[in-house]
């Protein structure tokens, strides 16, 4: 193990952190540290002196450089689809080449035991039973690659489309709307009437539609932005989404289905992550809540999400790679829909 320590505003106290990690579990092969975000040569000297006292090798020392910085906004890092990371990547590469002892790093790496991995599944060899449309553009880009691969392993051919730029959904048997930043593209999304209408028609025909977080927001009747302006969205979820100034939910939760959903039968429990600034406000009294959720950074218990026979939309970010039954059930439901078209 090589520990990377953020040394900003630290001197020899960085050595206490290194010592704690090194001594906490004697079975871990602790190879050394890389000092990150140093402010000057004098700063580096002070931190190195602390490491020398406890006998921890310093593999490298990286200085602070704003060119390495990734821009952020209310939900964390700005997606790579909106920025050109070339300068940051080149700056990091040059710093590592100059300031990290790569020979020592490789020697540590080659001394590690071999990691046994299962044979990768060749998704191209799997018979494709259904086509699933995946919304992917600047507004919807929060996907775990392994999660999408899990759908392919169950026999789905993924067809990517853009709710921002395309006029209609593709010819598919199911739809997936991932998370993202729809609130940053509200004018474009709300103005694309033909796209919204094609989604409404697909819903009316019973097409399975699965949505997470930003996808949920887009499927609601409207989104209220940070300034209070209202933008009409798809409208298949009877609720409005309202952006709030403070973070509403963050953390891993267990979601237990309150009814049958696209991911499984009632009482099926799944694990996922929530992180959102908006609230969903139902516009009907008898709202079909999808899940009862428990957990989060500040543990809570509450109902969330929307579920009908063919729609499941919630703030939950799910990795299908860790929910094999959910992936299977969704693809099977798409196959049933295809057979009945």
What are these regions (language model features)?
Residues 18-20, 48-52, 147-153, 191, ...:
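Short, solvent-exposed amphipathic alpha-helical segments in soluble enzyme
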Residues 175, 212, 234, 275, ...:
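Hydrophobic, well-ordered secondary-structure elements that form the walls
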Residues 158, 182-262:
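Cysteine-nucleophile active-site neighborhood
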Residues 128-204:
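Phosphate-binding active sites in nucleotide-utilizing proteins
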Residues 126-128, 140-152, 157, 243, ...:
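C-terminal and late-domain segments of enzyme folds
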């Amino acid at each position: 193990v090589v520990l990377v320590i953020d040394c900003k505003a630290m001197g020899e106290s960085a050595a206490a952190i290194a010592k704690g990690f090194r001594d906490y579990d004697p079975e871990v092969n602790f190879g050394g540290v890389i000092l990150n975000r140093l402010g000057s040569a004098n700063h580096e000297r002070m931190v190195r002196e602390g490491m020398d006292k406890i006998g921890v090798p310093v593999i490298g020392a990286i200085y602070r450089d704003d060119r390495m910085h990734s821009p952020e906004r209310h939900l964390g890092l700005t997606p790579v689809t909106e920025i050109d990371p070339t300068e940051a990547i080149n700056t990091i590469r040059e710093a590592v080449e100059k300031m990290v002892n790569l020979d020592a790093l490789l020697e540590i790496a080659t001394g590690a035991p071999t990691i046994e991995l299962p044979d990768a599944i060749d998704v191209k060899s799997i018979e494709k039973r259904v086509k699933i449309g995946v919304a992917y553009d600047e507004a919807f880009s929060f996907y775990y690659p392994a999660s999408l691969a899990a759908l392919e392993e169950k026999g789905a051919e993924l067809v990517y489309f853009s709710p921002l730029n395309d006029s209609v959904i593709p010819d598919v048997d199911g739809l997936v709307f991932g998370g993202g930043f729809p609130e940053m593209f509200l004018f474009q999304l709300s103005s694309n009437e033909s796209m919204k209408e094609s989604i409404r028609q697909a819903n009316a025909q019973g097409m399975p539609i699965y949505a997470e977080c930003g996808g949920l927001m887009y499927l609601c009747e409207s989104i209220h932005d940070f300034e209070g302006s209202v933008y009409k969205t798809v409208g298949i979820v009877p609720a409005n989404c309202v952006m709030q100034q403070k973070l509403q939910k963050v953390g891993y939760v267990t979601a237990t289905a309150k009814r049958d959903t696209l991911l499984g039968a009632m009482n099926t429990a799944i694990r996922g992550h929530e992180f959102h600034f908006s609230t969903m406000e139902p516009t009907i009294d008898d709202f079909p809540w999808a899940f009862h959720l428990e957990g989060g950074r500040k543990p809570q218990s509450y109902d969330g999400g929307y579920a009908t026979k063919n729609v499941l939309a919630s703030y939950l970010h799910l990795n299908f790679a860790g929910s094999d039954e959910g992936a299977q059930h969704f693809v099977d439901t798409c196959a049933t829909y295809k057979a009945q078209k």
